[in-house]
């Protein structure tokens, strides 16, 4: 697994200094008070994760990494999984969320707990504490909620929150359900303050309005100043919100995004993003990150920083062994590593998924073939050649490979043993052009 170190080993005077250097703080409550809080005795802090999907994504990973930094510094993490707020849904930039059934929310809550537990320490002297806001929200009746909590919220302040104001001015407006979300989140912080002496809440900067609702509530009803710390919305080299792959979120669940594709996402990041991503998504010390950034400038072709980044993040999320399999599969695909036949079917399917071709209906599918088909025809079907004559010519010149074995005869047929796991044949033209056919 990726090596996790605390701020002292990383060469910083405090964990707050390190988080700032890594670009993980965009705004916070009073900085001096926050520094005093984090530089003193260990405190409880929390971050909430709503089950709006069956998996967390790399936007959530930023929060988990911040939580792990604070945990390594000795502070006590509380991971709140939104069993109650997940039934309500926080306001989005546009459109109401679809409310999921309670049983689905419960299932997703459990899946999120497993993912969170894979990043944060669950054993030892400072394990993460898991809570669900359903436990204290479901038992509160409407009258108590309005008298004890709602009384402390001013509607004028609530409608001035950025997302709420935007939704109010839109055609679809905002429901009372989503409008009330910030009150529920504020009550969460109050509950955790009362029962765990929690004095710091974490979240993304796009949630600043919701984050400060608890801050204000605690000040009003307990007369105490607590803290909020928000991370920036990380963007890519083009200024777009980071973490989208072909329009889809980069999920942490390997059943929603394979380990191989997750690894490739990080491996394919451009040079210009290396400094910010190594700081934000790895626990590497400052000196090592600076060395990797310098290596990118002096020898970009080696892509050392990308390989280190991909290893560190993938092994952190998925573990060492699955990450090694993803790396080995990638190398085997181009004949630079082990035997393709040694790759398990799940990894093989994931590796080859990007080699699908478009059918007449515009769908991405595997090209089809059977034992006894000519390799030249298979190459055309897989999109490596425009014609059979072109395929034969390339075979004759020694430039075509089946499962990394050079094809010697332009009339050669596919054999039953050529189908890896009885399913796939990997075709290669030259050093880099790949194609695949699947048994029909």
From Swiss-Prot:
This protein's UniProt keywords: Aminoacyl-tRNA synthetase, ATP-binding, Cytoplasm, Ligase, Nucleotide-binding, Protein biosynthesis, RNA-binding
Principal location class: cytoplasm
NCBIfam families per record: tyrS
Record's catalysed reaction(s): tRNA(Tyr) + L-tyrosine + ATP = L-tyrosyl-tRNA(Tyr) + AMP + diphosphate + H(+)
Gene assigned in the entry: tyrS
Family membership noted in the UniProt record: Belongs to the class-I aminoacyl-tRNA synthetase family. TyrS type 1 subfamily.
Name the record gives this protein: Tyrosine--tRNA ligase
Organism encoding this protein: Bifidobacterium animalis subsp. lactis (strain AD011)
Subunit structure: Homodimer.
Gene3D superfamilies, sorted: HUPs, RNA-binding S4 domain, Tyrosyl-Transfer RNA Synthetase
Enzyme class, spelled out: ligase
The UniProt record lists the keyword GTP-binding: no
Binding-site positions, L-tyrosine: 46, 181, 185
GO cellular component, one term: cytosol
Amino acids binding ATP: 244
């Amino acid at each position: 697994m990726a090596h996790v170190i605390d701020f002292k080993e990383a060469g910083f005077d405090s964990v707050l200094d390190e988080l700032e250097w890594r670009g993980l703080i965009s705004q916070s409550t009073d900085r001096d008070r926050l520094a005093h809080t984090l530089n003193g005795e260990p405190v409880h802090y929390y971050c909430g994760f709503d089950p709006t999907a069956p998996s967390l994504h790399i936007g959530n990973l930023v929060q988990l990494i911040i939580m792990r930094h604070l945990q390594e510094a000795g502070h006590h993490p509380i991971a709140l999984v939104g069993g109650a707020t997940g039934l309500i849904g926080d306001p989005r930039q546009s459109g109401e969320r679809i409310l999921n059934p309670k049983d689905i929310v419960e299932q997703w809550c459990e899946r999120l707990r497993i993912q969170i537990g894979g990043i944060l320490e669950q054993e030892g002297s400072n394990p993460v504490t898991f809570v669900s806001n359903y436990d204290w929200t479901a038992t509160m009746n409407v009258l108590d909620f309005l008298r004890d909590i709602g009384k402390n919220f001013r509607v004028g302040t609530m409608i001035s929150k950025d997302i709420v104001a935007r939704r109010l001015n839109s055609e679809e407006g905002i429901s009372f359900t989503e409008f009330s979300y910030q009150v529920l989140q504020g009550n969460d912080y109050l509950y955790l303050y009362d029962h765990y002496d929690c004095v710091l809440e974490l979240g993304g900067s796009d949630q600043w309005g919701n984050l400060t609702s608890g801050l204000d509530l605690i000040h009003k009803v307990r007369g105490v100043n607590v803290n909020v710390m928000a991370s920036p919305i990380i963007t890519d080299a083009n200024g777009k919100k980071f973490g989208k792959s072909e329009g889809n979120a980069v999920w942490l669940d390997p059943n929603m995004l394979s380990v191989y594709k997750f690894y490739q996402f990080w491996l394919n990041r451009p040079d210009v993003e290396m400094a910010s991503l190594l700081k934000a998504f790895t626990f590497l010390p400052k000196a090592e990150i600076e060395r990797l950034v310098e290596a990118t400038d002096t020898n970009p072709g080696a892509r050392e920083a990308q390989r280190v980044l991909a290893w560190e993040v993938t092994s952190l999320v998925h573990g060492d062994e699955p990450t090694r399999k993803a790396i080995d599969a990638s190398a085997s695909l181009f004949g630079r590593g082990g035997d393709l036949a040694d790759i398990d079917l799940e990894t093989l399917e994931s590796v080859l998924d990007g080699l699908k071709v478009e059918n007449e209906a515009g769908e991405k599918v595997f090209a089809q073939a059977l034992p006894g088909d000519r390799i030249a025809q298979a190459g055309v079907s897989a999109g490596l050649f425009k014609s059979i004559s072109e395929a034969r010519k390339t075979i004759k010149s020694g430039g075509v490979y089946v499962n990394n074995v050079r094809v010697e005869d332009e009339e050669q047929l596919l054999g039953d043993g050529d189908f890896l796991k009885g399913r796939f044949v990997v075709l290669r033209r030259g050093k880099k052009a790949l194609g695949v056919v699947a048994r029909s």
